[in-house]
Amino acid sequence: MGGELIREATRDGRTVARLRCYDADGMTVVDAEVLRQGSAHPLRPGPYRFTTAPDAFRFVQEALLALQYLGCRVG
């Protein structure tokens, strides 16, 4: 992959999720951060490890699509 991909989902002007995709130890890793309303501490499920970058990208795309269906803006 050779770099990192960061995407953020917002709703009503507030960040609700952030996904970071990068290479590490011969795999592609996706870290997720979910920011709950009223909480100072984000949830950090994962990390999610994939043997190929296309699999990791697909995971990120599907997660972002689900967030869009829920009314979030993705950037």
Language-model region placement:
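Short intrinsically disordered terminal tails
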Residues: 1, 74-75
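A structural signal for the main folded, soluble domain(s) of proteins
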Residues: 5, 50, 72-73
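Short aromatic-glycine-(Arg/Gly/Cys) micro-motifs in beta-strand/loop hairpins
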Residues: 20-45
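Short arginine-rich
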Residues: 62-74
